[in-house]
Amino acid sequence: MPFTQFLDKYSDNLAIQYAIIFALLLGVFKLTVFSLKFASLIYDIFLAPATDFSKYGAASGKWAVVTGASDGIGKEYAFQLAKKGFSIVLVSRTQSKLELIATEIESKYKVNTKIVAFDASTDDEENYLKLEKAVFDLPVTILINNVGQSHSIPVPFLKTEKKELKDIITINTTATLRITQIVAPIIVSTVENPHPKQLRGLILTMGSFGGLLPTPYLATYSGSKSFLQAWSAALAGELQADHVDVELVISYLVASAMSKIKRTSLSIPNPKQFVTSTLNGVGRRNGAQERFATSTPYWTHALMHFAIDNTVGVYSKIANKLNLQMHQSIRRRALKKAARLAAAAEKKD
């Protein structure tokens, strides 16, 4: 039946006519909102210029604090920020690794470095005092909250070892909050001081698809990253008036020691590719179009995030089930590999 005939049929029924008009207007509104979000996504990923870090004090004697700086993504943040002209405070567990990285940064980029050997799993007050002593008199404008830990392999929550559970919560949440409480006031103080142009501060905290979507078999890790999402957005609201930009950076998989993935692919960048996209996209939402103070910067991750948000949704039953099946499969393969290695070791003995 043509639409005009349909309307004529119900011309005397005002309730149905109003319902039809409302449905049409709602459809136009939804389509317009989706189109604007999709246009913003494409602009953010492919067309927007790279962020100018001069507003954060690049090449002007300012400092950046990078946690988890000895490997992977954290190490890459340190190198790329040093390349932009920031001196770097390197915070991580292993002193010897930090010393090598500091030497390379100073030699290659002619900036200063400081080292803080810091085991985030211990929640030791001496660690925090050591960090505070290292940074209290520095003009810090950037904090990269990169330190983190996941499960060794996907595991049901009821079978999670107590130490692993405690370490994940302590490293991902407690240490991140305590470090931010130490460094953020210094950032606020630095950008408050008179400058030729208004400086801004920046706090980036590493999130994860594991926090975006509730993830069975990574329940503790997933919960810790979800906590960071809410905390970071709340902190962003608090520090806006202090000229400090706060963002949660969401990633899917990145080839690194933590992910145990060695090969890159279209959806799995190496740390250099991921950090480049993150720093270039500071201030833009990319794939996180519906989320305040949040970015999913790497282009394939951004498209995946946008697609999930605009189809099944992150809290849907189907998303949870697919996540469960994927991590059950990963666990089975990991256990088989461990069994093969154990059998091979027994043969050698």
Swiss-Prot record:
<dbReference type="GO" id="GO:0045703">
    <property type="term" value="F:ketoreductase activity"/>
</dbReference>
<feature type="active site" description="Lowers pKa of active site Tyr">
    <location>
        <position position="225"/>
    </location>
</feature>
<comment type="function">
    <text>Component of the microsomal membrane bound fatty acid elongation system, which produces the 26-carbon very long-chain fatty acids (VLCFA) from palmitate. Catalyzes the reduction of the 3-ketoacyl-CoA intermediate that is formed in each cycle of fatty acid elongation. VLCFAs serve as precursors for ceramide and sphingolipids.</text>
</comment>
<feature type="binding site">
    <location>
        <position position="65"/>
    </location>
    <ligand>
        <name>NADP(+)</name>
    </ligand>
</feature>
<dbReference type="InterPro" id="IPR002347">
    <property type="entry name" value="SDR_fam"/>
</dbReference>
<feature type="binding site">
    <location>
        <position position="221"/>
    </location>
    <ligand>
        <name>NADP(+)</name>
    </ligand>
</feature>
<dbReference type="Pfam" id="PF00106">
    <property type="entry name" value="adh_short"/>
</dbReference>
<feature type="binding site">
    <location>
        <position position="225"/>
    </location>
    <ligand>
        <name>NADP(+)</name>
    </ligand>
</feature>
<comment type="pathway">
    <text>Lipid metabolism; fatty acid biosynthesis.</text>
</comment>
<protein>
    <recommendedName>
        <fullName>Very-long-chain 3-oxoacyl-CoA reductase</fullName>
        <ecNumber>1.1.1.330</ecNumber>
    </recommendedName>
</protein>
<feature type="binding site">
    <location>
        <position position="254"/>
    </location>
    <ligand>
        <name>NADP(+)</name>
    </ligand>
</feature>
<comment type="similarity">
    <text>Belongs to the short-chain dehydrogenases/reductases (SDR) family.</text>
</comment>
<dbReference type="GO" id="GO:0005789">
    <property type="term" value="C:endoplasmic reticulum membrane"/>
</dbReference>
<feature type="binding site">
    <location>
        <position position="146"/>
    </location>
    <ligand>
        <name>NADP(+)</name>
    </ligand>
</feature>
<keyword id="KW-0444">Lipid biosynthesis</keyword>
<keyword id="KW-0472">Membrane</keyword>
<keyword id="KW-1133">Transmembrane helix</keyword>
<keyword id="KW-0560">Oxidoreductase</keyword>
<feature type="binding site">
    <location>
        <position position="119"/>
    </location>
    <ligand>
        <name>NADP(+)</name>
    </ligand>
</feature>
<feature type="binding site">
    <location>
        <position position="256"/>
    </location>
    <ligand>
        <name>NADP(+)</name>
    </ligand>
</feature>
<dbReference type="InterPro" id="IPR020904">
    <property type="entry name" value="Sc_DH/Rdtase_CS"/>
</dbReference>
<feature type="transmembrane region" description="Helical">
    <location>
        <begin position="19"/>
        <end position="39"/>
    </location>
</feature>
<keyword id="KW-0275">Fatty acid biosynthesis</keyword>
<dbReference type="GO" id="GO:0030497">
    <property type="term" value="P:fatty acid elongation"/>
</dbReference>
<keyword id="KW-0812">Transmembrane</keyword>
<dbReference type="InterPro" id="IPR027533">
    <property type="entry name" value="3_ketoreductase_fungal"/>
</dbReference>
<dbReference type="GO" id="GO:0005783">
    <property type="term" value="C:endoplasmic reticulum"/>
</dbReference>
<keyword id="KW-0276">Fatty acid metabolism</keyword>
<keyword id="KW-0256">Endoplasmic reticulum</keyword>
<keyword id="KW-0521">NADP</keyword>
<dbReference type="InterPro" id="IPR036291">
    <property type="entry name" value="NAD(P)-bd_dom_sf"/>
</dbReference>
<dbReference type="GO" id="GO:0141040">
    <property type="term" value="F:very-long-chain 3-oxoacyl-CoA reductase activity"/>
</dbReference>
<feature type="active site" description="Proton donor">
    <location>
        <position position="221"/>
    </location>
</feature>
<keyword id="KW-0443">Lipid metabolism</keyword>
